[in-house]
Amino acid sequence: MMGAMGAIGEFVQDRTYESYQTDLLFRSAVERQLEILGEAANRLKPEFQAAHSEVDWSNVVGLRNVIIHQYDEIDYEEIWAIATERVPLLLEQIQPLMSELTEEGGVVAPI
């Protein structure tokens, strides 16, 4: 999860929404990392998610599902806002939890 959020941060740094709209490679890279982030969140044990309900896990996973299954309905403006505004906030929420995630029992698969 940290890798995906870090990559998104690097990708959007010094870029504009206009470049996101017009650059297919850039847009695809951001969307792929959001997919990875959502899949990693989906692999967390329900007990871990419940213990950290301050994180909106369902939205993280839900976005992954929209990108993968409803790709023709993606709202680019919303994805841009998520990548530039919500992912940095999510990073702040998840970073303190990383020690728990790397201990046995935090995840069901590597993140």
Where are these regions (language model features)?
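Solvent-exposed interaction patches of small proteins and small membrane subunits
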Residues: 2-111
